[in-house]
Amino acid sequence: MQDLSVNEYLRQYIRTVPDWPAAGVQFRDITPLLQDPKVFRVLIDAFVHRYMDRALRPDVVAGLDARGFILGAVVAYELNVGFVPIRKKGKLPFTTVEETYELEYGSATVELHADAVKPGDRVLLIDDLIATGGTMMAGRRLLERLGATVTEGAAIVDLPELGGSSRLRESGLPLYTLVDFAGH
């Protein structure tokens, strides 16, 4: 890494794909971060070192479908805490609770097993990217409905111009992100 900060180091491994999935969209592809084991270790360590702090340490890590599973499961393993997936509707086999949220065009629903967390659990909610904040907000509502406290939201990438990080912070959710990108 030489003289680069962790954030600058990770930024150089995030690929920007123009006009995908639609014209005018700059897709931020995190898969290069996962392909090199040294880079992946730096990424995971950036989260793990933060959440080893006693004041921030969660009881459970919850990951949002689908790239939040990759990060969340490894971070939970490293912290020696449980991991729970928050899935798109219809993907979990047991009794679930669900939350519907609005998208730019339409809506989406996420769900969580009803026994995934216990009342009082301190939960870190993690995803790869924060755009509008809708998915993270829905995940938070699910966890809180089950009695857990979401202590912080975390993501690799923040797209602040889309307003999600501002909305989440205004709702009272602290956020930790590693790399900001301008634009959509």
Swiss-Prot record:
Catalytic activity: AMP + diphosphate = 5-phospho-alpha-D-ribose 1-diphosphate + adenine
Enzyme Commission identifier(s): 2.4.2.7
Pfam families found in the cross-reference section: Pribosyltran
GO biological process: adenine salvage; AMP salvage; purine ribonucleoside salvage
PANTHER family for this protein: ADENINE PHOSPHORIBOSYLTRANSFERASE
Quaternary assembly: Homodimer.
Name of the featured protein: Adenine phosphoribosyltransferase
Source organism: Paracidovorax citrulli (strain AAC00-1) (Acidovorax citrulli)
Taxonomic lineage of the native organism: Bacteria, Pseudomonadati, Pseudomonadota, Betaproteobacteria, Burkholderiales
Record gene name: apt
